Amino acid sequence: MQKLIIYGGKPLRGSINISGAKNAVLPIMAASILTDKLHITNVPKLTDVSTMKGLLRSHGADIETIEHQDEFELIINTRNINNFTADYDIVRKMRASIWVLGPLLTKYGKAKVSLPGGCAIGARQVDLHIAVLKAMGAMIEIEGGYINASSKGRLKGTHFIFDKVSVGATINAILAAVLAEGETLLFNCGREPEIVDLCNCLIKMGADIIGVGTSEITIKGKDALNKVSYKVLSDRIEAGTYMLAAAITKGDVKICGIDYHIIENLALKLIETGIKVVPIDNGVQVIYEGKLNAVNLETNPYPGFATDLQAQFMSLMTLSSGVSMITENIFENRFMHVPELCRMGADILVRGNKAIVRGVEMLKGAEVMASDLRASVSLILAGLSTNSKTVLHRIYHLDRGFQDLEKKLSNCGADIKRV
């Protein structure tokens, strides 16, 4: 099994180009079911993208992949969809597989989707997905680990209030509503940039969506959607991770190809710690200026601080001057990186959904193991900060969400290699 070997202590200097957003491209790929053909550009080279390609092909889609140096183009032809079951063998690998449920159901009136897998960071139930589809007239049962869904005729527009903000359920509801009969009003929706990107793609396809980027979305269903070409936005989580890498290594890095406003909440937190963050053309520059203050942090739905950056930010706080409190409000069990950071000398105490982080002067290299995607990269950041050797095991998580990570870090001076 592959592992990463990191020799830390080298400040990162240079520039890093950000790839397409994983959490945007996956629902956009699922949206191809709603039309006959969809051309997607700026597609990141990730195993989750390969998994979604495999899932769509299992439904009968024909996919042409055009490879460029830093991205893929996908041309997805879905005219011959003939299988409406998403099997466990594929779905277990990735939670985003649940996003074929809404498109299959709204276009073909039936879908059978295995309960999903992905990172082991809590229950992340599908109850809200099922509830909103039932409100649109779907008949749904869960049998043998599968969601069996059907409808008599088209789904019907509805008014639905999400009990809590759910990115995944918001996406499935939008994907179903764009071809439903009548008007759908969704309340307490996710506002994430990736949801906005999906909506922009659907609007380009001919969907009628009002309220994009707000918590209240109105969708007037169409009979059909059009073939289009669409460029996926850049990945704010990847950008934020490299911003934190620059800070933890006491470096100076330009993060290129990202809109500042979608990473502003992280930028403001970094400024609060004493890190210099400067907006530049098409990106942001992060500069360590000799101090790192402890700050408190709470994860919340967008525009709050992203849960997908919590582990990386915690790595930074392990080296801060003082004590920080990190509160995880999105997922339970998302502190699985803490024992591994403590193996490296971090002083962290977990109490429920809160972690108390007491800054130490330096972390020490160690053999550590990744438990999920974001935890794995937090351990890389920790390893980069040390003056010794760190070995990271179970790195297959990384390839689900970070394209060319070792190359991008090495180009900025990191000593990191995969063996």
UniProtKB/Swiss-Prot annotation:
Catalytic class of the enzyme: transferase
Pathway: Cell wall biogenesis; peptidoglycan biosynthesis
GO CC, one annotated term: cytoplasm
The EC number(s) this enzyme carries: 2.5.1.7
InterPro entries according to UniProt: Enolpyruvate_Tfrase_dom, Enolpyruvate_Tfrase_sf, MurA_subfamily, RNA3'P_cycl/enolpyr_Trfase_a/b, UDP_GlcNAc_COvinyl_MurA
Disulphide linkage map: none
Catalytic site: 119
Signal peptide: none
Described function: Cell wall formation. Adds enolpyruvyl to UDP-N-acetylglucosamine.
HAMAP family per record: MurA
Family statement: Belongs to the EPSP synthase family. MurA subfamily.
Record-given protein name: UDP-N-acetylglucosamine 1-carboxyvinyltransferase
Biological classification of the source: Bacteria, Pseudomonadati, Pseudomonadota, Alphaproteobacteria, Rickettsiales
